[in-house]
Amino acid sequence: MSVTMRQMLEAGVHFGHQTRFWNPRMAPFIFGHRNKIHIVNLEKSLPMFQEAQKFVRQLSANKGNVLFVGTKRAARDIVREEAQRAGMPYVDQRWLGGMLTNFKTVKQSIKRLNDLEAQIAEPGRLSKKEILTVQREVDKLNRSLGGIREMGGLPDALFIIDVGYQKGAVVEAKKLGIPVIGVVDTNNSPEGVDYVIPGNDDSARAIRLYARGMADAALEGRAQVISEIVGGEEFVEVEEEEGGVAAE
């Protein structure tokens, strides 16, 4: 689904932060200010958003994984819902230090989570008291790792709501050479972000627009591959039928 400038306006993407909190590195993306609030230039935001979508679409078409990251209160539910819709991994609670740079340890924690769930599922293995204790640990691990437990390995890219709030994620991705798509408000720096989306990172409507747009792009990428495979099969079948008729 393509996003229009009108939709961005309606979602409040253009509302930046108070002028006194601005980051000078965002100057190229600022249109002006109104009532001491910076106004983001949507004529720049829209094509940059579309460029990020194009990247996600191509990545998804090549079976790539985009890790959706949004742990601030306004973003959590939206990021989780849209990532799940697109079949992508996500972090919606807390970014654990080393989540990427120490992925080996993270994989061990995911294995422990799977083992504990298997223990609970096995009838008669644990007492009621033990089940409660284990369940508490499962819940804790699920909060941190539930969204990435099926990821398997490092993601091919990160999509981040509020790069200032998720600075740790940006630093880790940069260290590993993983591309970052990031929503950057006027109070943050675009440094270290490969695909900058200049815009409001606090409004739930704006966050929904970004996350839905990236999820749609991921789904479109996968659908494109499926249609190519199906189309190819249909073409082969037609050729065979024509060959059969000619042979007669």
From Swiss-Prot:
Transmembrane segments: none
SUPFAM superfamilies in UniProt: Ribosomal protein S2
Gene3D superfamilies per the UniProt record, alphabetical: Glucose-6-phosphate isomerase like protein, domain 1, Helix hairpin bin
Entry-linked InterPro entries: Ribosomal_uS2, Ribosomal_uS2_bac/mit/plastid, Ribosomal_uS2_CS, Ribosomal_uS2_flav_dom_sf
CDD domains per record: RPS2
GO BP term, example: translation
Alphabetic keyword roster: Ribonucleoprotein, Ribosomal protein
A Gene Ontology cellular-component term: cytosolic small ribosomal subunit
UniProt GO MF annotations: structural constituent of ribosome
Similarity comment text for this entry: Belongs to the universal ribosomal protein uS2 family.
Descriptive protein name: Small ribosomal subunit protein uS2
Organism lineage: Bacteria, Pseudomonadati, Pseudomonadota, Betaproteobacteria, Nitrosomonadales
Gene, per the UniProt record: rpsB
